[in-house]
């Protein structure tokens, strides 16, 4: 059996939100392989995030963030179980980080992949199946390639699957799980809206030189 270091146990705990002894056992069962240890914990259903997922999270806050210059704004609702936690600095910092994350991710439209309507996945499949680079490939190979591309595209639309802007080594989902382990309550990102100044407005295009000349009174 591989030597299980405290550093490795902490890394697994940060990624999953599971307890220290559970993480140590998972690493022992998987010979120190952290990826397999995460799978082991999920199979056993003992990660703290999963344990708390069914608990009602009706408190929390609506966080706002306006990017420098005022061109991008975000509103996001982040829920927890108690008002006490909602008023704490750890939860407030989490909500602020999530709002900044949304501001930095123009492609993100949904909280998680499960929220994406099936018609969007179906449309992506239709597009991918018609690509020229798949012509002539066996159906089974084509299907695997298409499924991989669809999964990648759907993750691009999902907030929880994005690398966290403050720490690229973890995803937003892992950040939330880590916060659940720290705070000890269920935490949910319920909904968000990203605003871009002038988005959807058809702007009148003018000759730039003529505009400058007009401003100079020529």
Curated annotation (Swiss-Prot):
Compartments reported by the entry: Cytoplasm
GO MF annotations, alphabetized: translation elongation factor activity
UniProt superkingdom: Bacteria
PROSITE patterns, A to Z: EF_TS_1, EF_TS_2
Major location category of this protein: cytoplasm
Location of the region described as Involved in Mg(2+) ion dislocation from EF-Tu in the Swiss-Prot/TrEMBL record: 82-85
Alphabetic keyword roster: Cytoplasm, Elongation factor, Protein biosynthesis
Signal sequence residues: none
A GO CC term attached to the entry: cytoplasm
NCBIfam families: tsf (TIGR00116)
Family: Belongs to the EF-Ts family.
Protein name (database record): Elongation factor Ts
The species this protein was found in: Picosynechococcus sp. (strain ATCC 27264 / PCC 7002 / PR-6) (Agmenellum quadruplicatum)
Gene: tsf
């Amino acid at each position: 059996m591989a030597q299980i270091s405290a550093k490795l146990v902490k890394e697994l705990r940060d990624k999953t939100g599971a307890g220290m002894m559970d993480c140590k056992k998972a690493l022992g069962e998987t010979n120190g392989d952290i990826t397999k240890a995460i799978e082991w914990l999920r199979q056993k259903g003992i990660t703290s995030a999963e344990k708390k997922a069914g608990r009602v999270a009706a408190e929390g806050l609506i966080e706002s963030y306006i990017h420098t210059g005022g061109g991008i704004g975000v509103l996001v609702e982040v829920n927890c179980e108690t008002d006490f936690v909602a008023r704490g600095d750890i939860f407030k910092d989490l909500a602020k980080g999530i709002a900044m994350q949304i501001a930095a991710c123009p492609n993100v439209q949904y909280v998680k992949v499960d929220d994406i309507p099936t018609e969007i996945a179906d449309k992506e499949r239709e597009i991918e199946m018609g690509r020229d680079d798949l012509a002539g490939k066996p159906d089974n190979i084509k299907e695997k390639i298409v499924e991989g591309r669809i999964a990648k595209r759907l993750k691009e639309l999902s907030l929880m699957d994005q690398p966290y802007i403050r720490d690229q080594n973890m995803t937003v989902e892992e950040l939330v799980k880590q916060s659940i382990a720290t705070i000890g309550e269920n935490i949910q990102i319920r909904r968000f809206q990203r605003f871009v100044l002038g988005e959807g407005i058809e702007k009148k295009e003018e000759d730039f030189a003529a505009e400058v000349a007009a401003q100079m009174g020529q």
